[in-house]
Amino acid sequence: MALNSINTNAGAMIALQNLNGTNSELTTVQQRINTGKKIASAKDNGAIWATAKNQSATAASMNAVKDSLQRGQSTIDVALAAGDTITDLLGKMKEKALAASDTSLNTASFNALKSDFDSLRDQIEKAATNAKFNGVSIADGSTTKLTFLANSDGSGFTVNAKTISLAGIGLTTTSTFTTAAAAKTMIGTIDTALQTATNKLASLGTSSVGLDTHLTFVGKLQDSLDAGVGNLVDADLAKESAKLQSLQTKQQLGVQALSIANQSSSSILSLFR
């Protein structure tokens, strides 16, 4: 190729190629700064983009898991609250039965104690029946178990129901006494019911702790997934900012180089003057 030619300006061609390359890099850096992402679409890096999208979907699905587990927590909390009420009522029922077992009582006092006992018994059934969260109960005998979401793959966390209604703790809606001797026998029956109720509540407490632990794990897992996606696609803005300044300087120099190269043709004309 001729070093001095008016048909082909090799220097200008090289300068233009370099300038175009710089402009392309500059556009990429500006896009990363504007979006905050180094991988904004599949054309930037298909493999990484696909991985990030899949991980983002998994992280987002964890919200449904957390919602389900939180419903589980609330369902158990309501049952435990009802259980506290029921154990308190059982304690009062034992007190009434013990007092009624006193053979020295007159009929009016005995009947008053029996009436109080029956009222306390009925309150137990009401407490168990109303122990619902969002229409769901694990305390009233309406279900044997509930399964909540445990992971994004649809696997479940199962909580076994614990019936703490009268039937669930060995009593009936007609459990009562009509004599001092029957009241004395009822004391043992109430003790057994109280033990049954506390055992069931302890089991629910264990399930609640398990839900709490798993919910904490799911939250940490979601945070880790979000961080992993960020590592894959987020731009290092400090690095990109420094690169932007460097490319802007390089662009200015490229424009000057192209201008100088374009002047070479004019220099050839001066040889013929």
From Swiss-Prot:
Q: Which organism is it from?
A: Caulobacter vibrioides (strain ATCC 19089 / CIP 103742 / CB 15)
A GO molecular function annotation here is:
structural molecule activity
Q: What does this protein do?
A: Flagellin is the subunit protein which polymerizes to form the filaments of bacterial flagella.
UniProt keyword Secreted present: yes
GO cellular component entries: bacterial-type flagellum; extracellular region
Q: Which UniProt keywords apply?
A: Bacterial flagellum, Secreted
Task: Please state the gene responsible for encoding this protein.
Answer: fljK
Subunit = In C.crescentus, the flagellar filament is composed of multiple flagellins of 29 kDa; 27 kDa and 25 kDa.
Q: Where in the cell is it found?
A: Secreted; Bacterial flagellum
InterPro entries according to UniProt? Flagellin, Flagellin_C, Flagellin_N
Which residue pairs form cystines in this protein?
Answer: none
Name the major location. secreted
Question: Which SUPFAM superfamilies did the record assign?
Answer: Phase 1 flagellin
* Recorded family membership: Belongs to the bacterial flagellin family.
Protein's recorded name: Flagellin FljK
